[in-house]
């Protein structure tokens, strides 16, 4: 679905943001770009929709080099969810969600019908349809953001730290709902985060980037914990030397804890990635 083929990017000031990154994202899966600030996560994501172009290498989406696709057409075929949701404050919730269908030529009635269906899909009460973003909680606004991202029936969803500003309980709920939504709809998700717990919860595969835009390792959560590729990955996942994460089977699934016994995440039974 998405392939980064030996992608590098150097900013005009000479700073290397990405250094020869190759990565493949399978259809209907979630790939998490995990790393510290300045590791190139968002830069890599922005190349999918041609917001940035590689200095060298290629980005392939749905079998085509994005350099050969009209950028407006490409961007309208992809859904986006950002940390601040990016909603129009002067528009109602239903109008926010209906933005893309309206741009694509759908009637107001058709767009509103689609928006209400998407509200159902992401767990938003239809009674909120005529409210404005400022009248919603942070978690509700993010649900609106997800609904709007799906409004154009996009098969690819780009998510840049969408839950980072939310409180832990709301964040955990949205993570579970996103995973369930992906399974129901079959969307391909590229998800940026610096949070290990979130990466383990959501990622079918996790791509760890380190400073300088170097792809340190790609694998499942189990791979990262049990077989880190280098000292950076070992340190990042807390498995350097004797500081190893633990995995314990429970009736609810596999519980991953840090070396001090603090739980990092729970992978439901059969979903150890």
Feature-to-residue mapping (PLM):
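Helix-to-loop junction immediately C-terminal to a conserved catalytic motif
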Residues: 49
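ABC ATPase NBD coupling module
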Residues: 65-79, 103-105, 109
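ABC ATPase C-loop
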Residues: 128, 149-150
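Hydrophobic anchor residue at the start of the ABC signature
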Residues: 146
């Amino acid at each position: 679905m998405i392939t980064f083929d030996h992608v590098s990017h150097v900013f005009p000031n000479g700073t290397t943001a990405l250094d020869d990154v190759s990565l493949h994202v399978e259809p209907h899966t979630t790939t998490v770009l995990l790393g510290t600030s300045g590791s190139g996560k968002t830069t890599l994501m922005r190349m999918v929709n041609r917001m940035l172009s590689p200095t060298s290498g290629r980005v392939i989406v749905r079998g085509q080099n994005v350099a050969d696709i009209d950028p407006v057409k490409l961007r309208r075929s992809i859904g986006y969810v950002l940390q601040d949701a990016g909603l129009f404050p002067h528009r109602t919730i239903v109008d926010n969600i209906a933005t893309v269908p309206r741009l694509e030529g759908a009637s107001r009635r058709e767009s509103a019908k689609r928006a209400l269906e998407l509200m159902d899909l992401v767990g938003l009460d239809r009674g909120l349809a005529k409210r404005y973003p400022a009248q919603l909680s942070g978690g509700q606004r993010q649900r609106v953001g997800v609904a709007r991202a799906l409004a154009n029936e996009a098969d690819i969803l780009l998510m840049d730290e969408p839950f980072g500003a939310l409180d832990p309980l709301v964040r955990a709920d949205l993570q579970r709902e996103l995973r369930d939504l992906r399974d129901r709809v079959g969307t391909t998700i590229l998800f940026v985060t610096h949070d290990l717990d979130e990466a383990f919860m959501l990622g079918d595969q996790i791509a760890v980037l380190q400073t300088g835009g170097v792809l340190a390792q790609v694998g499942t959560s189990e791979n990262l914990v049990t077989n880190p590729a280098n000292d950076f990955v070992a340190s990042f996942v807390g498995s350097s030397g004797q500081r190893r994460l633990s995995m314990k089977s429970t009736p609810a699934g596999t519980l991953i804890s840090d070396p001090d016994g603090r739980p990092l995440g729970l992978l439901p039974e059969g979903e150890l990635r």
